[in-house]
Regions:
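Loop/turn elements at helix/coil->beta-strand transitions in domains of secreted/extracellular proteins
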Residues: 53, 72, 111-113, 132-135
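Bacterial Sec-exported substrate-binding components of ABC uptake systems
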Residues: 3-5, 9, 18-61
């Protein structure tokens, strides 16, 4: 009986250890005093000095991640009927254009302090935004692992 109890306690400790927060160098704020430091799917380290207040999301699939963590937006990509329904929270958020043809000028007019972009469509636009000193997270959405990682990264961004 003691062996079974000891085994159960050991198993519970292993489970609790697995649930403890991990120090992930790619997503910890460290001692730099930054709000968050994340690495996007280009391998670019994006440092956010403070919690973003004016986020623009350039992809409808990435918009779903922002909605999942109840994030506020300053701008969003056009959502077509076939892409799914737009959460009510984002109905009045300015539209920056369709995923394949986002307007740089409209994005800049939103005065974003962070842009979340798709690796499939926005590499060139990301470079232009970064030239304007706007932090850009470029994320993939192809695999299940991408989906899990995106939820973690966007959750970190929104706190």
């Amino acid at each position: 009986m003691k062996k079974i109890c000891l085994l159960i306690v050991a198993f519970c400790l292993v489970l609790l250890t697995g649930c403890a927060p991990q120090n992930d160098a790619s997503q910890s704020s460290g001692s730099s005093g930054a709000y968050a430091v994340v690495t996007d799917d280009r391998g670019t380290v994006v440092t956010l000095a403070r919690k973003p207040q004016r986020v623009v999301v350039l992809s409808t699939s990435l918009l779903n991640f922002a909605a999942a963590v109840d994030g506020d937006l300053a701008g969003r990509a056009t959502v077509k009927a076939e892409d799914g329904s737009l959460p009510e929270k984002y109905q009045q958020v300015p539209d920056v254009g369709p995923v394949y043809n986002v307007s740089l000028e409209t994005v800049l007019a939103c005065q974003p302090d962070l842009v979340i972009a798709s690796a499939d469509h926005h590499e060139k636009l990301a470079a232009q935004l970064e030239e304007s000193h706007i932090p850009v997270l470029v994320l993939k959405t192809k695999t299940y692992d991408d989906v899990k990682r995106n939820l973690e990264v966007i959750g970190k961004v929104y706190g």
